[in-house]
Amino acid sequence: MVSPIIDVKHLDYRYPQQATDQLTLHDISFTVMPGEWVAIVGHNGSGKSTLAKNLNGLLAPAAGTITVDGQVLSEETVWDIRRKIGMVFQNPDNQFVGATVADDVAFSLENQGVPRSEMLTRVQAALEQVNMQDFATREPARLSGGQKQRVALAGMIAARPQILILDEATSMLDPRGRQEVLTTIRDMKANSALTVLSITHDIDEAASANRVLVINDGEVKEEGTPAEIFQHGEALIKMGLDMPYAERLKAALKRQGVQVPAQYLTEKGMADWLWQLRSNK
């Protein structure tokens, strides 16, 4: 039987300035299986980014356990676990350290002591995978937001983590940049057994995941497939979230007497279905 690659049990967290009876995270429990894409959604201040920082040891929980690939997260294991996790943050400008795109992608490999010949091969392959090979000698500051996040993802590809955590990685991007990043992640998953955990308030992004956790007031309120979660439209709105564009479009079509198959959860899926519907007329 396959074991979870992430296993969180009864996790509590409070910030130092909080009173002892106040918790930012309360009794959080969930698992993530190898190769799964799980989206953790919630409004700003719900606790989802605090959870992400607990998962890779940037913050230490007040109670509960986090197990990653069979290792319980602790002061003794944190560096081993961090080697298994790649993290892409909200602001791409905060994660660049190299003078050029290629230098930045190579940074984590230098820290790992990867031989130079292998490093060059992995950097080139990673940039090709995110379609940024023509920008290898560019300064990161001169890239667009979507390009910067694709370079950050290239750094993760080159480092070959088992788990990729995206902490609001698309929230500062325009729609085109957001789509570039999500397409890159789908391609990464198609080419490897990568496990993805995306922390987001963008309910449309969650439609790409295999499973969705909804966090509100520091607690897991809902868990299920995107289709199951999107059925709880009113509950999501009460928690400060919106319904995905595809679901709003479905509702509008149903009001016009057009029945839409339930499996179309994304804008692209709906566009393809509408085009097929039009072509059949």
Curated annotation (Swiss-Prot):
Protein name according to UniProt: Energy-coupling factor transporter ATP-binding protein EcfA1
Subcellular location: Cell membrane
Annotated transmembrane regions: none
Protein's job: ATP-binding (A) component of a common energy-coupling factor (ECF) ABC-transporter complex. Unlike classic ABC transporters this ECF transporter provides the energy necessary to transport a number of different substrates.
Stretches assigned to the ABC transporter domain: 6-242
Subunit structure: Forms a stable energy-coupling factor (ECF) transporter complex composed of 2 membrane-embedded substrate-binding proteins (S component), 2 ATP-binding proteins (A component) and 2 transmembrane proteins (T component).
GO MF annotations in UniProt: ATP binding; ATP hydrolysis activity; ATPase-coupled transmembrane transporter activity
Broadest EC class assigned to this enzyme: translocase
Entry EC no(s): 7.-.-.-
Chief location of this protein within or outside the cell: membrane
Stored SUPFAM superfamilies: P-loop containing nucleoside triphosphate hydrolases
Family: Belongs to the ABC transporter superfamily. Energy-coupling factor EcfA family.
UniProt-listed PANTHER family: ENERGY-COUPLING FACTOR TRANSPORTER ATP-BINDING PROTEIN ECFA1, HEAVY METAL TRANSPORTER
Coiled coil: none
A GO cellular component entry from the record: ATP-binding cassette (ABC) transporter complex
Topology relative to the membrane: Peripheral membrane protein
Taxonomic lineage from the root: Bacteria, Bacillati, Bacillota, Bacilli, Lactobacillales
UniProt keyword annotations, A-Z: ATP-binding, Cell membrane, Membrane, Nucleotide-binding, Translocase, Transport
Residues the record lists as binding ATP: 42-49
Short name of one Pfam family: ABC_tran
